[in-house]
């Protein structure tokens, strides 16, 4: 069993926010691979399914913590304990302001870089889980970071975000087989990041 978790906030108010990029990717994986119905457990919405990989068919648990973004570790750690898993069995998808819109990077270990969801995960699980960082760009002003990530994706964002979610689904077997580099390369090949300034989306406003 491997866990794929998204970071985000529960409720319709936040559903299309940049901060909910992780939830949106998990939803797309759920639909693309025909996972089972969502149910409530571990203070989260969870769904089980399988994905065919080079190493054989892999059981996967999808998790969307309902604890709000800054407490996601509390929910995921409950699932890890229940299934007797290790932090290395966990992959978390989350938005990343320090990456340009449309960029994706895989990270294992290291610091939380100010991401409170990652901070919560590390507090509960340590540093040895995998993070899939989805670039949403920086607004250019520290005071605007929260309004930026708690705003909905704009139309210009969807031009790269939707292809990226599709690419993540197609490349997912590489990730589940432990080939982080191949997964990252394949996603960026299938959905190249737009060639614009990292702050462009924020400047465009509601474009």
UniProtKB/Swiss-Prot annotation:
Site (Stabilizes the basic form of H active site to accept a proton): 95
SUPFAM superfamilies per record: Peptidyl-tRNA hydrolase-like (SSF53178)
Main localization (coarse): cytoplasm
Binding-site positions, tRNA: 14, 68, 70, 116
Keyword NAD carried by entry: no
Catalysed reaction equations from the record: an N-acyl-L-alpha-aminoacyl-tRNA + H2O = an N-acyl-L-amino acid + a tRNA + H(+)
Keywords recorded for this protein, A-Z: Cytoplasm, Hydrolase, RNA-binding, tRNA-binding
Entries under PROSITE patterns matching the protein: PEPT_TRNA_HYDROL_1 (PS01195)
GO molecular function, one term: peptidyl-tRNA hydrolase activity
Record's keyword annotation contains Cytoplasm: yes
Active site positions: 19
GO biological process, one term: rescue of stalled ribosome
Family the UniProt entry places it in: Belongs to the PTH family.
Protein name: Peptidyl-tRNA hydrolase
Organism: Hyphomonas neptunium (strain ATCC 15444)
The organism's taxonomic lineage, starting at the top: Bacteria, Pseudomonadati, Pseudomonadota, Alphaproteobacteria, Hyphomonadales
Gene label: pth
């Amino acid at each position: 069993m491997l866990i794929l978790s998204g970071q985000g906030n529960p409720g319709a108010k936040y559903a299309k926010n940049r901060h909910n990029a992780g939830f949106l990717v998990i939803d797309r994986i759920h639909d693309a691979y025909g996972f089972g119905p969502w149910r409530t457990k571990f203070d989260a919405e969870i769904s089980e399914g399988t994905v065919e990989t080079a190493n054989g068919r892999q059981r996967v648990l999808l998790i969307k913590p309902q604890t709000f973004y800054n407490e996601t570790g509390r929910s995921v750690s409950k699932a890890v304990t229940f299934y007797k898993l290790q932090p290395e069995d966990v992959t978390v998808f989350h938005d990343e302001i320090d990456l340009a819109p449309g960029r994706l990077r895989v990270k294992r270990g290291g610091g939380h870089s100010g991401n409170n969801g990652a901070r919560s995960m590390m507090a509960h699980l340590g540093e040895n889980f995998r993070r899939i960082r989805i670039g949403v760009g920086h607004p250019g002003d520290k005071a605007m970071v929260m309004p930026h990530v708690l705003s909905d994706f704009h139309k210009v964002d969807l031009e790269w975000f939707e292809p990226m979610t599709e690419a993540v689904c197609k490349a997912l077997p590489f990730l589940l087989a432990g080939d982080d580099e191949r997964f990252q390369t394949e996603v960026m090949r299938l959905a190249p990041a737009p060639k614009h300034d990292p702050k462009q989306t924020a400047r465009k406003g509601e474009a």
